[in-house]
Design a protein with these regions (language model features):
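Surface-exposed acidic, glycine-flexible loop patches that form ligand/cofactor-binding
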Residues: 2, 10, 89-93, 141, ...
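Helix-boundary capping/turn motifs
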Residues: 51-55, 147, 271
Length: 301
């Protein structure tokens, strides 16, 4: 169920009161004081009238039809569902993964990533540019939301900083964040938390460090379409209208997905292991291949 927050930012859930400053009128119009809540305040639930709602089946069908090339729509649907249960999946073997949508300029790769994220949050929120965003900002994004995908755009083998690249290897796979000393003195060590799944976009596949990142992700090629038909344009616009909370929104679809959490917690571990065992029997088990099989087994489960 959904429990609404009041104007002071207080919500009662399961008999306990919680204070959410990002949604409190205390901070409304307070200028710089509200800047730290700017991103968090975008994560809202919208009650959509029944006659305007898009069902899960309709949303999935649109995703599949709009991004039909190379079955990218199917990959996007699967990963969007996986994101909703990232916390439940990651804790099984401390493993997760990420899709890497690779294609030329204007191929639509970023739109696929935004469509995945739009199940959770408004598509109008800026995505993270790996070329101009700071290392610290990326680290903060990873811990801001739990199970809400972050889009990392403009991956480039040549220009990406080594700190970002090494961080990505942990973020997309085992969820390990950067270790650092707590404070300027002392011996306490703290880890940057990684709670968010990511979707990466770029014009080239990651090939640094002997393909260390590439073996942890699923590469989905997005070729540039030569000619879009009128029907394809209309389907794309329809999907984007549905994704926009100002027009319709997907809150009810996300609720349908989240209701599956008990089933995911009960069956996912066994299904993932079964998928991995089947892949091991069919393929030669080398180091890099083994990592790819573990990654693929998450989608198969």
């Amino acid at each position: 169920r959904f429990d609404a927050v009041n104007e002071l930012g207080v919500v009662t859930h399961n008999g306990k009161n919680y204070y959410l400053p990002a949604f409190s009128t205390i901070y409304a119009g307070s200028g710089k004081q509200s800047d730290k809540y700017e991103l968090i305040s975008q994560l809202v639930y919208k009650e959509i009238p029944i006659d305007k709602r898009c069902t899960f089946d309709e949303w999935a069908s649109l995703m599949d039809r709009v991004y039909k090339i190379n079955d990218n729509g199917k990959w996007a649907i699967l990963f969007a569902i996986m994101c909703a249960f990232r916390s439940n999946i990651h804790c099984i073997d401390r493993l997760f993964t990420a899709p890497f949508f690779m294609g030329p300029m204007s191929s639509g790769k970023t739109q696929i990533a935004i469509s995945i994220r739009s199940l959770f949050i408004s598509p109008k929120i800026p995505i993270f540019n790996l070329n101009i965003g700071t290392d610290a900002a990326m680290s903060t994004l990873m811990s801001t939301f739990r199970d809400v995908p972050v889009v990392l755009d403009e991956y480039n083998n040549k220009d990406i900083s080594d700190i970002k690249f090494q961080a990505l290897k942990g973020i997309v796979y085992d969820g390990d964040g950067r270790q650092k000393r707590k404070g300027t003195s002392g011996k306490e060590i703290e880890n940057d938390k990684v709670y968010a799944p990511v979707v990466i976009c770029g014009q080239e596949t990651p090939q640094r460090d002997d393909n260390a990142l590439m073996s942890r992700i699923i590469v989905c090629e997005v070729p540039k379409p030569k000619n879009r038909t009128r029907e394809e344009v209309e389907l794309f616009n329809k999907l984007k209208d549905i994704e926009d909370p100002a027009k319709i929104g997907l809150s009810n679809v996300l609720f349908e997905v989240l209701q599956l959490r008990p089933l995911v917690m009960q069956h996912f571990r066994a299904l993932k292991q079964k998928s991995y065992d089947e892949l091991k029997q069919a393929l030669i088990n080398a180091g890099e291949i083994d990592r790819l099989m573990k990654t693929a087994s998450l989608f198969l489960a």
